Amino acid sequence: LGNPARPGGMSPLVGSAYRGICNALLCCGRKKYSLAYEYGLLRGGLFVLGYCHFIHRYAISHQIDRVLFFSRDGEILKRVYDLLYPGNGSKYVAWSRLAALKMTAHRNPSLFFERMFLHKSGTGITVKQALLSADLYPLFRSHPLPFSSPLDRKNVHLLQKAIRSRWPEVLQIYAQQSQAAKQYYHAVLEGCKKVCAVDIGWVGSGAISLMQLAEQDW
């Protein structure tokens, strides 16, 4: 009954077994599940199960003191991880690629500007919205920038020039945020010698940035 909507691309043995499990759960009539639940089970269930098992094996084999699950994307992983391995001592922590980008701006200004502004040009957001997302609008509100105009390939270079003209002040703003993050993570990592961070992003920039901050800046 449910096979046309079941995931493919797996080996015949694993695919058949997983489709059978999904069909038995979703089509037995005992309970009606939401579409969001069905989608998560079908498209992410097997991945999450395998990923959590990999994380746990890695933590044991490398004698990890604490596993960190980053906010938002890591929430469901943390919940499944706790179901599979209760009392594991892992932590769900506040962290994001945006926060990492701002707190490591001093390391690579070009990368900061590229990801914070250049990649957003042509998406429909205004110059003001771009500055607000970077926590920089109060610093530049008196500058002659086209705040109400959509961010595009032309005005993004004007924005870059303005930011470069006040770069030390930009870094000072982010240094204050970094100090707050330092206090937060000091409590999270207290007593730990080896920590593993779980980052869903394909680049892994969140985990790499946190490692750099913890080992070199904090």
Q: Regions from the language model: what does each represent?
A:
Residues L1, H143-W218:
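PRPP/pyrophosphate-binding module of the type I phosphoribosyltransferase fold
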Residues K31-F47, K161-Q176:
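Glycine-rich phosphate-binding "P-loop"
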Residues F47-S61, Q177-V188:
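A short, well-structured juxtamembrane/interface segment
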Residues I60-S61, R79-K91, E190, S209-W218:
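Short, surface-exposed basic-aromatic patches at helix termini and helix-loop junctions that form
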